[in-house]
Amino acid sequence: MENNTTIIEERIKFIRERIGYTQMEVAKTLGISRSLVSNWELGFVNISLKQLIKLAYLYQVPIDYLLGIIDEIDNYPYQFISNMDLKSIGLRIKEIRKINRLTQDKFAQKIDTKRSSISYYEIGKMMISTADLKQICETFGVSADYIVGNLKENIKRDKKIKLKIKDIKEKIVNN
């Protein structure tokens, strides 16, 4: 997996090929062009959260898997939502921020975004970007599927374990 793509692009292509879909079939199902699917897989265009959720539903995998938050999908307790509710997503983001006792400014700094974006996310005025969602999950050890409503309860992850696994994988690749 050594190229310019990130884990998101690698996984959306891997799952598509594994279940036997062509880029054209995915494009038709999602109502988009085949070239957009290709551009996602090549890492030329960032996939929006709305489209990522549609892909997760189509592929029947958790968003956490596509984002690289988890590596195993067996027995993962997610359910798919049919309609994204920006206010509910915002409330979950606010909950994560409050649990960590952070102001919107500090929260924004930790995930490398603007405070105004956090404010808009929390009040349901703006859909969270896929990059910000992934950063929240990695920084605070929370589930993307929980944030978007696919899980009723958050599955808290130990960030240190994730880092150790990453270190082990790198050592294996380098040896």
Describe each PLM feature range.
Residues G68-S88, R92, V148-N175:
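Short, charged recognition helix plus adjacent turn
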Residues G20-N39, R101-S119:
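Short alpha-helical DNA-recognition segment
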Residues E17, K28, Y57, K98, ...:
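Alpha-helical residues within the helix-turn-helix
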Residues E25, L36, N46, P62-Y65, ...:
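Residues in the helix-turn-helix
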Residues M1-R18, N75-I99:
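A short, Lys/Arg-rich alpha-helix, primarily the initiator
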Residues K50-Y65, A131-Y146:
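DNA major-groove recognition helix of helix-turn-helix/homeodomain DNA-binding modules
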